[in-house]
Amino acid sequence: MIPLVSVITPCYNGANYIAACIESVLAQTLVNWEMLIVDDCSTDNSAEIILSYVKKDTRIRFFQTNKPSGSPAIPRNIAIDNAKGHYFAFLDCDDLWLPRKLEEQYSYAEANNYLFVYSNYEKITSEGIRNERVITVKSQAKYSDILKSGEIPCLTAFLHRSCVGKLRFVPAPKEDYVFWLLILKQAIVAYNTNTTLALYRDSLASRSSDKVAMLKNQWKIVRHLERVNFFYSLYCMAIYSLKGLRKYIR
């Protein structure tokens, strides 16, 4: 029997999208999953929508934060702490999976004895319209690789719970990137299935309007958090900037 997969979904004011997000999980061809949705004190009717699905499918579990955290990190950590699965997968409330996402990634990981896999993804409009804007990422990612690129799309990550252990998301800018660094620092390598398995909603709200702030955050992580030497940090930043430019013009 295929081991249980825990789907981790933070939600904040996602009433316009959360139903479609849940439906994309319900449509998975791999059916042995649990979906842990953690509402971060939404002020819209997100919780009401989520609870309507909880009543219909016992695989969906609902949690709430005690107070607004202002970051997906805390809701994700709550979900991880309560997860029962052998594998973890991450899906934000405004994104979607294609139906074979979990099955393909599980099969790929098992066939190759990989602990951590990810995939390419397609950008869609805020209204959910697909326009073939596929983002292809590197075929594998080591710690040294993502210092320069950060390219492990959170909505496509699929990893064995042994990778996570006691590690948790840090409430800070680029919290998913810092989490991948912590995991890959354990000499773990992540591998791309080289297929497109998820849909990323490319809305104005999801784009950073301050590219300078993004670069500053990247520098803080590489230079100060990871304590990479000054000149190699500059090299990493140059590569990161070039890759970021290519990403935002696609």
Residues of each region from the PLM?
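Cell-envelope/extracellular polymer assembly enzymes that use nucleotide-activated donors
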Residues: 3-6, 24, 34, 178
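A conserved hydrophobic helix/loop-capping motif in glycosyltransferases and polysaccharide synthases
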Residues: 5-17, 21, 28, 38
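Acidic helix N-cap motif at the loop->helix transition within catalytic regions
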Residues: 17-19, 44-52, 96, 100
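A conserved acidic beta->alpha catalytic loop
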Residues: 24, 39-48, 67-69, 92
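Glycine-rich, basic loop-to-helix element that forms the pyrophosphate-binding segment
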Residues: 65-83
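Conserved nucleotide-sugar donor-binding catalytic segment
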Residues: 81, 137-213
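Short aromatic/hydrophobic "clamp" motif used to bind/position activated sugar donors
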Residues: 88
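Conserved donor NDP-sugar-binding/catalytic core segment of glycosyltransferases
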Residues: 100-131
